[in-house]
UniProtKB/Swiss-Prot annotation:
Domain of life: Bacteria
Organism: Escherichia coli
Regions crossing the membrane: 32-52, 295-315
Biological process according to GO: lipopolysaccharide biosynthetic process
Pathway participation: Bacterial outer membrane biogenesis; lipopolysaccharide biosynthesis
Gene for this chain: wzzB
UniProt name for this protein: Chain length determinant protein
């Protein structure tokens, strides 16, 4: 019984082990086919790497401009609006907001070209508006860096032009408002002067009718329109001549308005150097390209070539076995 059991045990074979060994033997015998497949795959991969467009990404980080960068713009706004001028912090937020909007519009335009270009802008930190990360994907490292800097400058120039136009429009409107205010105050002052002369002339008429030639009162500060004739005709005639030649009397507001108008006239918007952003990090020169990845491509080529070669070998052997049966 013990011998028979040993024979039975010796005749038990593991089918999976036999199949694996047979599989490895088949692959070894067909190694030349596999090697050729790998070589062909590598050659195709090298060809792909030679013709594929490279992608390099240059990145920059920007934020709102410094106070010094918008000093001229802030001064112009203060001259135009006076006490109603926006705060510097509000101007900074407005400028970077306009830059971001203009940059996004440019990115959309580039993406819709016949040959799309990838330009992006997004917050550097999630859930925070600033700073902003801008990037450009080019076919060379130097080209990506140069293009990104060019597009940033292009957007900044565009925002600058828009701001200058807005300033010129606001200056024209502010100048008109100040000129209208001056004319109104001058008309009022002239009317007050004319009214004063008429009042004195009326008092002179009463004085003549009452034959009052000399002053009848001592305290002139107590004189009213009804008692002015008591100053006497001689004094009233002298007052009329004096009032006629005396310049118009204006309030301090009139002279402040003239000063504001002079300040606006002295504004030279064309000389303003306005920047809507500030670099936190200038456009980088990428050292690693995004695609194609040489190492990954070649590794995949070897794996794919090996799999195809193994498939050919196993398929060919399976076909031979089928025909032999």
């Amino acid at each position: 019984m013990r011998v028979e059991n040993n024979n039975v045990s010796g005749q038990n074979h593991d089918p999976e082990q036999i199949d694996l060994i047979d599989l490895l033997v088949q692959l070894w015998r067909g190694k030349m086919t596999i090697i050729i497949s790998v070589i062909v795959a590598i050659a195709l991969a090298i060809g792909y790497l030679a013709v594929a467009k490279e992608k390099w990404t240059s990145t920059a980080i920007i934020t709102q401009p410094d106070v010094g960068q918008i000093a001229g713009y802030n001064n112009a706004m203060n001259v135009i609006y006076g006490q109603a001028a926006p705060k510097v912090s509000d101007l900074q937020e407005t400028l970077i907001g306009r830059f971001s909007s203009a940059f996004s519009a440019l990115a959309e335009t580039l993406d819709n070209q016949e040959e799309p270009e990838k330009l992006t802008i997004e917050p550097s930190v999630k859930n925070q508006q600033l700073p902003l990360t801008v990037s450009y994907v080019g076919q060379t490292a130097e080209g990506a860096q140069m293009k990104l800097a060019q597009y940033i400058q292009q957007v900044d120039d565009k925002v600058n032009q828009e701001l200058e136009k807005d300033l010129k429009d606001n200056i024209a409107l502010g100048r008109k408002n100040l000129q209208d205010s001056l004319r109104t105050q001058e008309v009022v002052a002239q009317e007050q002067k004319d009214l004063r002369i008429r009042q004195i002339q009326e008092a002179l008429q009463y004085a003549n009718q009452a034959q009052v030639t000399k002053p009848q009162i001592q305290q002139t500060q107590d004189v009213t329109q009804d008692t002015m004739f008591l100053l006497g005709s001689e004094a009233l005639e002298s007052m009329i001549k004096h009032e006629a030649t005396r310049p118009l009397v204006f309030s301090s507001n009139y002279y402040q308005t003239r000063q504001n108008l002079l300040d606006i006239d002295n504004l030279d918007v064309d000389k303003l150097d306005i920047h809507a952003y500030r670099y936190v990090m200038k456009p980088t020169l990428p050292i690693r390209r995004d695609s194609p990845k040489k190492a990954i491509t070649l590794i995949l080529a070897v794996l794919l070539g090996g799999m195809v070669g193994a498939g050919i070998v196993l398929g060919r052997n399976a076909l031979r076995n089928y025909n032999a049966k």
